Amino acid sequence: MQFGELVKTLAAVESTTQRTTMVKLLTSLLKRARPDEVDKIVYFVLGDLKPPWEGVELGVAEKLCLRAVSKAAGTPLSELEAVYKRTGDVGEAARRALSAAKRPGLLAFGQQKPLEVSEVYDTLLKVAKAAGEGAQDMKISLLASLFARATPEEAKYIARFVVGKLRLGVADMTLLEALSEAFGVGKEALERAYHVWPDMGKLARHVAEGRPLEEVKITPGVPVLPMLAQRLSSASEILAKLGGAAVCEYKYDGERAQIHISGGSVKIFSRRLEDITHAYPDVVKAVKESVAAGEAILEGEIVAVDPDTGDMLPFQELMHRKRKHEVAAAVESYPAVLNLFDVLYLDGEDLTGEPLIYRRLRLSEVVHETEKVSIARWRLFDDPGEVDVFFHEAVSLGMEGLVCKSPTSIYEMGARGWNWIKYKRDYKSEMIDTVDLVVVGAFYGRGKRAGLYGAFLLAAYDPQTDMFYTVCKVGSGFTDADLKKMYEVLQPYKIPHRHPRVVSKMTPDVWFTPQVVIEVIGAEITLSPLHTCCLGAVRPGVGLAIRFPRFTGRYRTDKSPEQATTPAEMVELYKRQKKVAQPE
């Protein structure tokens, strides 16, 4: 497929405000592609070259990209930088430069062979792999070779892609729907396969080649989508929901981790499926010493501890390990321990279809507990009073609360169901709990906030519809530093219209592709005719909103937009808050 054909679809997707139109455009594109192009097309649409755990990054900043455009188009770098400064869009700067360029002979577009999708993809992969001395010059040379042959519109999307600002906002669930339509594969079967093997490019090529989804199996080295929990605010409700009995375990304030063991090596993946092994060399060493298995996939929570007292530290202390050059120092200052709570795969056996109690038994058989690695403290209860005693014990030890699980539940990858329920200490707040919401819009600030965004439009994610529904407009809780950070973080996701996956009655000054997740709390959840979350779920014609919302200061970089709070959770929180909410 010619790259220009892909670019036409990308432009159409970018301009639509309808999700159904987006799916139709992508379906048509996939139908026209050869099987050996489908994976590359899917990666390009998602703005990636490989799945997140492979860690393939282009390493191209705006300045380097503009230097490559300058080299290809013969436009002075200063002119390109001026356009970029005015528009904030490196793609637009590239488009204008190549539109005005005088490229003689073979470099005149229309006279050379058009770019192919595979050709562009392979070149960008070379850009990502360029390393060591001379890597920057190599990246510029490779990119310039693409820009020299690209049409202005093609250059626009190549430039945006390489700096990580494609801004399409196409999610995996949207692509799964398009794949289902394009290749006649059942959507539910496709979703199940995706939960086991969340590599959209590889999965797309698999179905495009007509291969059966039964071949897709859980495999060490490939992270699965984690099972997620609902939330309730009383032990009696939790036990009733779980059929009278629950496995209750400490909810640690740390980083959820998938531990993959294979061939003597250990890899650690985050809940967003990113390879974070480099950040936890001490945990890798401890796992090798504590787990007696040739191949395994385990789940647990990595928690920072005080090196002097052994007391657990807040989740934020693990952020010191995110900077590669600071890991060695962080290991000394903020040592980590691993609390394991599940085993999904063990020496050739897929355990996800086995009941929780059996998985816990198998976990205890292979884990030799040490100071660094232990099994999360848990107990089986059928009495609400005993659950509450255990809950208060957990909170007094610095835990967030409990996670209560059905003893007979299987491991449902990618699902947020009622087999796992969070029971958290935030219950003392009128709103009962914090929520994780997605920034979909912003309002310009005034006074001392002038030049920045003063408030943000936030939304919940509904996995049933793959859409985002607004919950609140929040401007409280942000420090001056927070506002500056939010402005910088959100700029790559700024778009000229409401995103097709966002449902909103409010019109902010600026719209964003749903990407950034932040934690919010408020006075209460109230009925509101202004917001679209849970519209009609509690009362006809009104949705649910957060009254007096406040940013907690926590950026949920560990969560994808599709892992944000759901409308179903908002309804549960509304029902369980101490104060009965009235319409705004």
Swiss-Prot record:
Cofactor needs: Mg(2+)
List of catalytic residues: K251 (n6-amp-lysine intermediate)
This enzyme's EC code(s): 6.5.1.1
Top-level division of the source organism's lineage: Archaea
Top-level class of the enzyme under EC nomenclature: ligase
Recorded catalytic activity of this chain's protein: ATP + (deoxyribonucleotide)n-3'-hydroxyl + 5'-phospho-(deoxyribonucleotide)m = (deoxyribonucleotide)n+m + AMP + diphosphate
SUPFAM superfamilies: ATP-dependent DNA ligase DNA-binding domain, DNA ligase/mRNA capping enzyme, catalytic domain, Nucleic acid-binding proteins
An example Gene Ontology biological process: DNA repair
Protein keywords: ATP-binding, Cell cycle, Cell division, DNA damage, DNA recombination, DNA repair, DNA replication, Ligase, Magnesium, Metal-binding, Nucleotide-binding
Gene Ontology MF terms: ATP binding; DNA binding; DNA ligase (ATP) activity; metal ion binding
Binding residues annotated for ATP, in chain numbering: E249, R256, R271, E301, F341, R416, K422
Known function: DNA ligase that seals nicks in double-stranded DNA during DNA replication, DNA recombination and DNA repair.
Protein family (similarity comment): Belongs to the ATP-dependent DNA ligase family.
UniProt protein name: DNA ligase
Organism for this UniProt entry: Pyrobaculum neutrophilum (strain DSM 2338 / JCM 9278 / NBRC 100436 / V24Sta)
Gene: lig
